Amino acid sequence: MRRLILGVAAACAIVALTASGAPAKNGNGVMCVLHARLTTTNETTGSTSTARGHTQIKVRANGTIEFKTHILNQDGETFVAGHIHQAPVGVAGPIVVPLFVSPTPATSARHIRQSGVATPNAGTTGAALCTNPSAFYVNYHTTAFTGGAIRGQLH
């Protein structure tokens, strides 16, 4: 019985020592991989855009954010910017990571594919995105919907 108790205590100690509030990293220096489904129904701007899309975010241990976005742009709207904002569902929030902004050429292609590396604004860390992704959303803007055309919470 004493061995069983010592074994359980040792296992609990190991778990307690290895668990932390910081996001885990994989062997490639990636702290977490997040996704956002971009639609107008998630927008707070009253957007009637017909576009929809998906963004994948990889938060790297060095603080950079890699992103890949694909937007199906059925009506040829002109997309001019994309950001990560901090706010819960249904609330507009401040930009914390610029994904692309002017002078990046605006595009009205039917299939928009964008990828790149971004750096969070001062006061925001990649670890914050990993720890509480639903507190952040991805938002893409068009010339018609400058406040945001499509949006999705990170998860």
Regions found by a protein language model. Give the residues of each.
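Metal-centered catalytic cores of metalloenzymes
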Residues: 2-7, 12-82, 86-155
